[in-house]
Each structure stands twice: as structure tokens, then as C-alpha cells.
Amino acid sequence: MPWPTAARPHVPLCYKVVVRREFSAGGVVVRNLRGRPALAAIRPAGKPEGTWALPKGLIAPGERAEVTALREVREETGVEATPVEKLGDVRYVYTWDGERVFKVVSFFLFRYRAGRLGDIPPEHVHEVAETRWLPLEEAPELLAYKGEREMAAKALERLSR
């Protein structure tokens, strides 16, 4: 029997799809090292060696995405950065503890301003196993996650103009 076109006041539980939404922001921090652009990458705690990612985290209530990205960059890498522009959004669905989660991560391009990569504040050191400047032109192959590789490629394209 087809679904009726009128409003359905009751939908059986077996037809309900519960999807939680998460909104995060992250940064592609770029600087010149030995005449070549490089980006700040992290290896998140608990991930195997060679699992490089971009710094990112959940947007706090009332916080703007760009502010979150700057905060996460500082917390996870130890460096300060200056905003350039928004690069784009990465959208994906994952399952956490049996619950489907729809996630949107807004990424921003930043220029390195100050600080030493790896000088992570003590309260955040448990989140990051390692930090490294990756050559920007190699980052689209070195980053572990597809959406982050796309953001690195966008940053490279933007800085090549």
C-alpha cells in the first residue's frame, strides 16, 4: 500500500531515521618554509603513524565557524594564524554508538602569524600525538581524509593565483 499523501500524525518507529547533526570548523594554516608553502598538520591521538589531518573541532554554542577554526588551530597546533578566506564545507555521515551523525565541517584558509608548531596548551595535549609542517603541494596526497585532501588542494589553488 502506498504512503498516503495527507499528513501522517503517527509514523511507526521502524520508519523513523534519527540523525544527529554536528557542526565543526577547521583550518588550513599555510606558511613558507625554505621558499615553499607548507601547511600545519596533526596526527590525532590514537591514530596510527602517518595519519595526518587538519586541526578542527566542534563549534561552541554562539561561536562563529571562523572563530572556532582559529581556536582549534591554536589548541591543536600551538600556532597563531590570520584569516584569509573560507575554503568550503565538507559533509559526511558517520555512525557513533549506533547513531547516525550528519556532520558539516567548515574549513578556512589561514596564514601563519606566530608560534611554534607543537607548542600545544597542556589542556589539549591529550588530543594530538604529533604535529608537522607538510609541503602544501604534497598535502592532497598525505592527508588521511578525502574532504581534507580536497581543502588542501583548494588552498594550493588559491595561493597559486
Residue ranges with predicted function:
Residues K154-L159:
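C-terminal alpha-helix
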Residues I59-E150:
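Unchanged
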Residues P12-L54:
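N-terminal strand-loop-strand
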